[in-house]
Amino acid sequence: MNYFPVGKLDLKLLERLIALNPIKDPRVIVGPRIGEDAAVIDFGEKYLVAKTDPVTFTTYRIGWYAVNVNANDIAAMGATPKWFLATLLLPEKRTNKKLVTQIFNDIIKSTQALNITLCGGHTEISGKIDRPIVVGHMLGEVEKNKLVVNTNACPGDDVLLTKGIAIEGTAIIAREKTSALRKEFGEKFVKRAQAFINNPGLSVVKDALLANKAARINAMHDPTEGGLATGIFELTKASETGAIIEMKKIQIYKETRQICKLFNIDPLGLIASGALLIALDPKDTKKVINILARNGITCTKIGKLTKESEGLRLLRKGEFIKMPMFKVDEITSLIT
């Protein structure tokens, strides 16, 4: 039997599975769809935006990760994250009061920081897992005229990127491969890389809501597993477009470059929470970049959307090459 590798399901298989469940409820505005970050349901005056996402690559501050990665997906639809539910699956013979209290504290502090209400969930100790898993469920709301869906992106749109890539991957590797990194680069380097979850930070809620307030945004996408390259693929898949991306415009932090070089992994395919992709009319690009900058968020134009027939191209060292694709995230070669 051929078993699937760690990571996301094969997209062609996922498309076939999604097609088995046609949406008949007219109140479902956005259902399951590759390239969209959340579902959208009509709730009268506003839309309810709903998302679920687990945290599996790390156990460090797992409650904090669960809140932030789900909030990011809600915000990428232009919505404000409001209500959070969590399913905690805890390993038998490894779970104690200290572990559970730490996870709960992380969830509570993280929701409070984003003005989100923890409103429910489920806890369970299982003999079938060997580490804690948190599955987050986030709900948000948005004015109907401010909803952002990626199907609205079109050829000619500018593509912007907030902050830099592989922020989450850098932080996780620094936490999981501390000894090797300390030996190679020293203690200060390790601490800086581990602190990436706070600075530059994994949250893009502020990035997304500021951009959506400043201009008419055609698409926003929160690249996560599979890195920036997969995020761009998902955005263009949803919008039926192609893209030209300039490698030299993509911000890659020094720590990220050094970690990727040491472990021979590609930062374009490394889990990328903390960055936000934005597609918009070029006339609004400067306005959005300036507003984000005034709020302490770096934002760079990294390319343009093109016709779908032109595919995904990366301009690297003056040459166009095909955008690399990653069936599994680069981090899986180091952490399983």
Predicted regions and their residues:
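Helix-biased detector of long, well-ordered alpha-helical tracts
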Residues: 1-336
